[in-house]
Design a protein with these regions (language model features):
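Noncatalytic, solvent-exposed loop/strand surfaces
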Residues: 1-129
Length: 129
């Protein structure tokens, strides 16, 4: 839709923004309660809508193309979130893992989620996870 999505997660300030690709002007910016992350966001055009999926150490989140939070959940991610999400088979996949951290969660998420999608326990599931 003519914009570049930038995620800036660090210890001082974290946010996601949409930048107009033609003018370089910021279209919108949404604050994020996150620490550092190395994952690249995924623009996921699914059967219901287009979402910006962003994993994080605190919460995994999805935003609209205007920066509105669509869904989120605590994925109990590893020390550093490095893998970028990807889409396949009608779902988006979020994973986490880092050298020396044995905790490496993975999630498959179906389209249409809203609000808090938190599963029960580490092996739990919801209608969208």
């Amino acid at each position: 839709d003519g914009q570049v999505v930038v995620v800036y997660d660090n210890l001082e300030e974290s946010w996601i923004a949409g930048i107009d690709a033609a003018t370089g002007r910021e279209n919108w910016r949404t604050a994020r309660d996150e620490q550092r992350s190395w994952a690249t966001p995924l623009v996921w055009a699914n059967e219901l809508r287009t979402e910006i999926v962003v994993p994080g150490m605190n919460r995994n989140r999805s935003y609209s193309l205007t920066g509105e939070l669509l869904w989120e959940f605590d994925g109990r991610m590893s020390n550093l979130v490095i893998p970028s999400p990807f889409a396949a088979h009608g779902m988006v996949y979020i994973a986490s893992g880092y050298v020396g951290d044995q905790h490496r969660p993975s999630f498959a998420i179906t389209p249409g989620g809203a609000g808090d999608l938190a599963p029960e326990g580490l092996d739990g599931e919801t209608s969208h996870i």
